[in-house]
Amino acid sequence: MPSTRDIRRRIKSVKSTAQITKAMQMVASSKMQKAQQGALNFRPFAKMAGDLVNHLAADSGDYRHPLMETREVRKRAVIVVSTDKGLCGGLNANLFRELSKYDLSTTQFIAVGRKPAQYLARTRRKLVAEFAYHDIPTYAECQAISKFAQDLFLKGEVDAVDVLYTRFINTLSQRPDLRLLLPLASAQSLATEAGAAPAGAPDDHQHFDFLFEPDPVTVMDKLVLYLLDFRVAQILLEAKASEHSARMVAMKNATDNAEQLVKHLTLEYNKLRQSNITKELLEISSAAMALG
């Protein structure tokens, strides 16, 4: 049976742990708000780009880009986007569980974040590249990932590129999501994914006629690549929002559990202390009666 000294030491240790998890909860909460705000601020920009692609697609007829080439999928690349650190509940475990669906002999992997890189290396999967990204991803980081995927596809090394990441739903809910990055859909579908209204659909915004130089197709060739970068950026922002949300919830649960444990240990300490006092009083009373 533990002594009162042992219980006091354990209470002190648990309180110290609770202070650490509380601080980590506050940091994750602050980062989560920034990541969510970054995703929200990005949406209008992505929508405007989608509107422009939609307008160009209507003017350029049956536009086709090399990244839109559809072929039989014999080899596939998967971009796995996850965290650099742990302590985020089951977020990484739930995401990595989805990797079991892929045939290792025909699939190569691209890690975005340290945790997926470590997992892929540990499970002996074919890791061809590793990328890092900040809490608010820079355009250069998004472009590097996008460019690497484009090169694999255009050189014929893979026939399709998927992105596996954790989709942000709300603070308490994040879900693994699989998105096809390459080949790209048609121009109209690509614009719709970016948030634009489908061609011919009613729109509340005023329409304008644009004059493109040198021609819509040349502009489209550039814009399609930008839209691909935007899709990568949106995925990275959602992954970061999911990470910080999961970490905040995990640290909050750890803090709550520590506080409950402190209450339980304090009650146990008081009971043991009361029992010791009662025992000492009985011993004193018994000794007094024996002397009397």
Where are these regions (language model features)?
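C-terminal beta-strand-loop-alpha-helix "lid" module of Rossmann-like NAD(P)-dependent dehydrogenases
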Residues: M1-G292
